[in-house]
Structure formats: structure tokens, C-alpha cells
From Swiss-Prot:
Its cofactor is Zn(2+). Belongs to the bacterial ribosomal protein bL31 family. Type A subfamily. Pfam families: Ribosomal_L31 (PF01197). Keywords: Metal-binding, Ribonucleoprotein, Ribosomal protein, RNA-binding, rRNA-binding, Zinc. Part of the 50S ribosomal subunit. This is Large ribosomal subunit protein bL31. GO terms for biological process: translation.
Length: 74
């Protein structure tokens, strides 16, 4: 590697809002606080929420359905 062009890496502690802590190397020199990590993210934990798209469509139709029907009739 060329001298003087690469940033210095430091070992830092990353702290998640769930309380999980781990060490990593980064160009940052101070601890890092994050909101989501692999211990609490739904993709990694398998506890994903299923979005009720049918309920959203029904809610949209209830709210705007009358207006859309009036436009279709004219």
C-alpha cells in the first residue's frame, strides 16, 4: 500500500439501542451508537411484520371511494 494516502483504522465499540455491543474497526475514533443491529432487526430475527395491504386498500376506498365514483360517473 502507498504510504500516507490511506485513513487510519481504529477499534471502536458499536452500541445498539437494544443494548447489544460489539467491536469493529473504523476510520471513526469515537464510539458509535446505532438504532438497529443484527440482534434486533426483524430481517435477522425472523419476526417480520406482515403488512396488511388489503386493509390499506379498503381504508383508501372508504376515504376516497365516493370521490372516485363521482368522477367515473361524469
Amino acid at each position: 500500500m502507498k504510504e500516507g494516502i490511506h485513513p487510519e483504522y481504529h477499534e471502536i465499540t458499536v452500541t445498539c439501542s437494544c443494548g447489544n455491543e460489539f467491536k469493529t474497526r473504523s476510520v471513526l475514533s469515537k464510539p458509535l451508537h446505532i438504532e438497529v443491529c443484527s440482534s434486533c432487526h426483524p430481517f435477522y430475527t425472523g419476526k417480520q411484520k406482515i403488512v396488511d395491504t388489503a386493509g390499506r386498500v379498503e381504508k383508501f376506498n372508504q376515504k376516497y371511494g365516493r370521490h372516485l365514483q363521482k368522477q367515473a360517473q361524469t
